[in-house]
């Protein structure tokens, strides 16, 4: 994976809502800013029950968005990442509809999981209570197979039916996705919800040894096709470290809440500790199409005796701080307040979660860009977007608070804002300075500040992050300072917004 900043976006939420329009915006408005792009699901349909993450046909581009030819055209200028939704597919898919009609006589019957296929001898209360699920309740819903009511496994929503990845039909389906991606000039595949993709009686059915075998198998198939694999798993931080040794790339989901914690408390020790132990083969993010995963810095959800990167009371306080910073907007979009019950996420844009404080926001981005890994910026974050309460009220889907539709005119207007200009400059700096391909080190000054340094053959750069200097959402004091050396000499910026860095 190229060591350059990437964008995460939906195909339909930048410009006129097509892949061609998105491509034009990337090539013009963000030229030199984003080298690669993760296009969130654009399959048929892209606007289903979970915004494309419940595909009816995972191998077809929704014709309302464009075609595979449009994807291939984009690949001429940008490396492309695409999702492979490993755990489930839409109940409206031809395969599941065939099972509904024919029951066990359907050729696709083995492809889908029922309670009895995982628990052929029945399940005890302990078995069922031990299943980990990111939603309340048990992971089953009623469907009729040829008139007979069955309990179908659904890890997420009733419309997203789980695939039996052990079955021949299930595996053939997943490989058909890999084949299509390889044929369409895709460079990277993100394995969505893979942590739930291997079911086994008597286990939590989440990130078990069987899951790691599935991940290894998928990775092998990716290598055969020239596809680099990225794993998407929200879990206890030690599991993230363990996963990283088994895959090409893993998300650093602990970073977003850790930086929110540092900026609200002034304490950098948790960030320093994470810097010391985190995997370097990471994709770093502050925001994604999902909420902010506070679970990733707390204690293990399956064993509370395993402590997190911060105490659980700090996690609770952080959630309350985000709600306060957003004036209750995130609270209206999180948990039982909205239709999608996310037990481990707070729904808000990252900019709003910081109380729309420009200095805090650019400092968080700077730390993200300085930590080892490939940085990705979500399209709403790329424009320092605020919570979309109008869309939330329209859909009552909590995550939609962070899924705004930007017209081209709106994009152009936001590009004039100083904080967005500063972010674009910072991304270009990250892409152009060769020090970021060199060696990394960090130092701390007690619990007050942390400095990150990169040294290359012809350049070097040091970012100092000192959140205590600007505590409070209304405090406009800069909390990040940057020093760098390039071919033109030594440079320094004490305010990344007023004086953004430029590589000579």
From Swiss-Prot:
Binding positions for sucrose per the UniProt entry: 88, 190-192, 232, 289-290, 342-345, 399
pH dependence remark: Optimum pH is 6.0-6.5 for the phosphorolysis of sucrose.
Temperature dependence: Optimum temperature is 48 degrees Celsius for the phosphorolysis of sucrose. The His-tagged enzyme shows an optimum temperature of 58 degrees Celsius. The immobilization of the enzyme on Sepabeads EC-HFA increases thermostability, and optimum temperature is shifted to 65 degrees Celsius.
Consequence the record notes for mutating residue 232 to Q: Loss of catalytic activity
EC number(s) reported in the record: 2.4.1.7
Binding positions (substrate): 50
Function statement: Catalyzes the reversible phosphorolysis of sucrose into alpha-D-glucose 1-phosphate (Glc1P) and D-fructose. Is involved in sucrose degradation. Also displays transglucosylation activity in vitro, by transferring the glucosyl moiety of Glc1P to a broad range of monomeric sugars, such as D- and L-arabinose, D- and L-arabitol, and xylitol.
Protein name: Sucrose phosphorylase
Source species of the chain: Bifidobacterium adolescentis (strain ATCC 15703 / DSM 20083 / NCTC 11814 / E194a)
Lineage: Bacteria, Bacillati, Actinomycetota, Actinomycetes, Bifidobacteriales
Gene: sucP
């Amino acid at each position: 994976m190229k060591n350059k900043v990437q964008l995460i976006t939906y195909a339909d939420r930048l410009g006129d809502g097509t892949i061609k329009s998105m491509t034009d915006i990337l090539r013009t408005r963000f030229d030199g800013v984003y080298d690669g792009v993760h296009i969130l699901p654009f399959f048929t349909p892209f606007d289903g029950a979970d915004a494309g993450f419940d595909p009816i046909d995972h191998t077809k581009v929704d014709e309302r968005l464009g075609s595979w030819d449009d994807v291939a055209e984009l690949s001429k200028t940008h490396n492309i990442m695409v999702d492979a939704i490993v755990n489930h597919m839409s109940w409206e898919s031809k395969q599941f509809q065939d099972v509904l009609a024919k029951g066990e006589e359907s050729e696709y019957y083995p492809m889908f999981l029922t309670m009895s296929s995982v628990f052929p001898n029945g399940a005890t209360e302990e078995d069922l209570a031990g299943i980990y699920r990111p939603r309340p309740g048990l992971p089953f819903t009623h469907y009729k197979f040829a008139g007979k009511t069955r309990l179908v496994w659904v890890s997420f929503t009733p419309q997203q039916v789980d695939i039996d990845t052990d079955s021949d039909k299930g595996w053939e389906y997943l490989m058909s996705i890999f084949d299509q991606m390889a044929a369409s000039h895709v460079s990277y595949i993100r394995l969505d919800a893979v942590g739930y993709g291997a079911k086994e009686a008597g286990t939590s059915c989440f990130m078990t040894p069987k899951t790691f075998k599935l991940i290894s198998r998928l990775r092998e198939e990716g290598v055969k096709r020239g596809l680099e694999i990225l794993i998407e798993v929200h879990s206890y931080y030690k599991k993230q470290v363990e996963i990283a040794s088994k895959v090409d790339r893993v998300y650093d989901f602990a970073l977003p809440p850790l930086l929110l914690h540092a900026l609200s408390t002034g304490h950098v020790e948790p960030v320093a500790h994470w810097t010391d132990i985190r995997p370097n083969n990471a994709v770093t993010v502050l925001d994604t199409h999902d909420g902010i995963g506070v679970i990733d810095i707390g204690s293990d959800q399956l064993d509370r005796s395993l402590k997190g990167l911060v105490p659980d009371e700090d996690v609770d306080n952080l959630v309350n701080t985000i709600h306060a910073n957003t004036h209750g907007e995130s609270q209206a979009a999180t948990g039982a307040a909205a239709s999608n019950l996310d037990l481990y996420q707070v729904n808000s844009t990252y900019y709003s979660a910081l109380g729309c404080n420009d200095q805090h926001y650019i400092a968080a981005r700077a730390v993200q860009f300085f930590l080892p890994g490939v940085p990705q910026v979500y399209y709403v974050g790329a424009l320092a977007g605020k919570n979309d309460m109008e869309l939330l009220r329209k859909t009552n889907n909590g995550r939609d608070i962070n899924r705004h539709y930007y017209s081209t005119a709106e994009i152009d207007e936001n590009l004039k804002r100083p904080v967005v200009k500063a972010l674009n400059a910072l991304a270009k700096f990250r892409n152009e300075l060769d020090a970021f391909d060199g060696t990394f080190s960090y130092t701390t000054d007690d619990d007050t500040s942390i400095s990150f340094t990169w040294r290359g053959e012809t350049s070097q750069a040091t970012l100092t992050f000192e959140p205590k200097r600007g505590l409070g959402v209304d405090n406009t004091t800069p909390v990040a300072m940057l020093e760098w050396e390039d071919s033109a000499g030594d440079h320094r910026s004490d305010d990344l917004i007023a004086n953004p860095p430029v590589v000579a």
